[in-house]
Curated annotation (Swiss-Prot):
The gene is rpsH. Keywords: Ribonucleoprotein, Ribosomal protein, RNA-binding, rRNA-binding. One of its GO terms (molecular function) is structural constituent of ribosome. PANTHER family: 40S RIBOSOMAL PROTEIN S15A. This is Small ribosomal subunit protein uS8. The lineage of its organism: Bacteria, Bacillati, Cyanobacteriota, Cyanophyceae, Synechococcales. Part of the 30S ribosomal subunit. Contacts proteins S5 and S12.
Amino acid sequence: MSNHDPISDMLTRIRNASQKKHTTTTIPGSKMSLSIAKVLQKEGFISDINEEGEGYKSQIILSLKYSGKNKFPTIRSMQRVSKPGLRIYKNTRGLPKVLGGLGVAIISTSKGVMSDRDARKQGIGGEVLCYVY
């Protein structure tokens, strides 16, 4: 079965693993998935990224973060914004602040995948991939 939207698949795998309190989750490897994972790590939502394999058989293993003794997930929600059937683009002024700045919007720009904060600092807009909080 082919996967028409690998970003949605990645977000769903992370969301499901987080809800079940798994320590790691595996996602199919791609440049876009790796870029999104690096933004999530930089923003403190995941703790570690490991790559396995090469080419079309590559996989990315993400180590999820939890807080407190009850292992409360760091990622509370992940929402896909721009979809294959309806792309959402925003300029610098139109970039959203997720939960008043507590969450992160992941943006695909001409300078790579980055958080909304980094895109605002650099003064560029792009495609809003997802919201994470």
